[in-house]
Amino acid sequence: MLNDMPALTHEQQQLAVERIQALMAEGMSSGAAIAQVARELRAGYTGERVTLRWEEDTEVLETPAARAETDPYDSNPDDD
């Protein structure tokens, strides 16, 4: 979950994407370009702020218990 994120309009999001693409075209890595644009947005943004939450943040992830292997052709598994 990310707190205090700028609530961007579609147009602002598109401008951010174009800025990231321009930085990458100049040779910057995608991660560095995204980080730089994010810093720029946070530094100059004065509008509404929101909290972002991904579905994984709200789900309880459980691993099913491992089941013992059984032989589907063994009519009486206790006699082994």
Curated annotation (Swiss-Prot):
Q: Which Pfam families match?
A: UPF0181 (PF03701)
Region entry Disordered: which residue ranges?
58-80
The disulfides recorded in the entry are none
Q: Which family does it belong to?
A: Belongs to the UPF0181 family.
What protein does this entry describe? UPF0181 protein SG1330
- In which organism is this protein found? Sodalis glossinidius (strain morsitans)
